[in-house]
């Protein structure tokens, strides 16, 4: 029996795949649990249309992410921070702080999950920060922590 998978099933396929399975497996397990539907003409057309829409949406997401990354890579982002002796920060610069600063400076909403930092930055200096944007877009931006002497 041909079925269209509604959810990912290990060993069989992914959501939207059309698979040939044994009749009993489809009738007694997959269909009653909402894991698959019988592959009718209407269902096949609907799945194809959904795949086309999903691919189109992914292309748009990737293009938008590439534009955001290019915008961020155009400049060195200066981050003012209060420092003590030896260039040590009072506190630390985390991905949350950095996302807020980048969002404010670039005018584009930057999610903290896009910023890949192993640990918070605690000293002044120039840093290469890895970005992982939606759509599989990756790149690095430059961030410079500039000290403001506490007075």
Curated annotation (Swiss-Prot):
Q: Which Gene3D superfamilies match?
A: Ribosomal protein L9, C-terminal domain, Ribosomal protein L9, N-terminal domain
Show the GO MF annotations: rRNA binding; structural constituent of ribosome
User: What keywords is this UniProt entry annotated with?
Assistant: Ribonucleoprotein, Ribosomal protein, RNA-binding, rRNA-binding
Q: Which GO terms describe its biological process?
A: translation
Stored InterPro entries: Ribosomal_bL9 (IPR000244), Ribosomal_bL9/RNase_H1_N (IPR009027), Ribosomal_bL9_bac/chp (IPR020594), Ribosomal_bL9_C (IPR020069), Ribosomal_bL9_C_sf (IPR036791), Ribosomal_bL9_N (IPR020070), Ribosomal_bL9_N_sf (IPR036935)
- Whether Transferase counts among this entry's keywords is no
Q: SUPFAM superfamilies, from UniProt? A: L9 N-domain-like, Ribosomal protein L9 C-domain
Write down the superkingdom of origin.
Answer: Bacteria
Q: Name one GO cellular component term.
A: ribonucleoprotein complex
What Pfam families does UniProt report for this protein, alphabetically? Ribosomal_L9_C (PF03948), Ribosomal_L9_N (PF01281)
PANTHER family, per database record: 50S RIBOSOMAL PROTEIN L9
Q: Which family does it belong to?
A: Belongs to the bacterial ribosomal protein bL9 family.
Its function, per the record, reads: Binds to the 23S rRNA.
What HAMAP family does UniProt report for this protein, alphabetically? Ribosomal_bL9 (MF_00503)
Specify the protein name.
Answer: Large ribosomal subunit protein bL9
Q: Which organism is it from?
A: Pseudothermotoga lettingae (strain ATCC BAA-301 / DSM 14385 / NBRC 107922 / TMO)
């Amino acid at each position: 029996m041909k079925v269209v998978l509604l959810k990912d099933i290990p060993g069989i396929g992914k959501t939207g795949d059309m698979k040939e399975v044994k009749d009993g497996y489809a009738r007694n397990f997959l269909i009653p649990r909402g894991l698959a539907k019988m592959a009718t003409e209407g269902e096949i057309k609907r799945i194809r249309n959904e795949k086309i829409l999903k691919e189109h949406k992914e292309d748009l997401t990737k293009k938008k992410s590439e534009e955001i990354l290019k915008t961020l890579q155009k400049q060195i982002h200066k981050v003012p921070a209060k420092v003590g002796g030896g260039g040590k920060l009072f506190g630390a610069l985390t991905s949350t702080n950095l996302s807020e600063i980048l969002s404010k400076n670039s005018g584009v909403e930057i999610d903290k999950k896009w910023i890949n930092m192993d640990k918070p930055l605690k000293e002044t200096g120039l840093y290469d920060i890895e970005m992982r944007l939606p759509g599989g877009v990756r790149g690095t931006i430059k961030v410079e922590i500039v000290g403001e002497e506490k007075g």
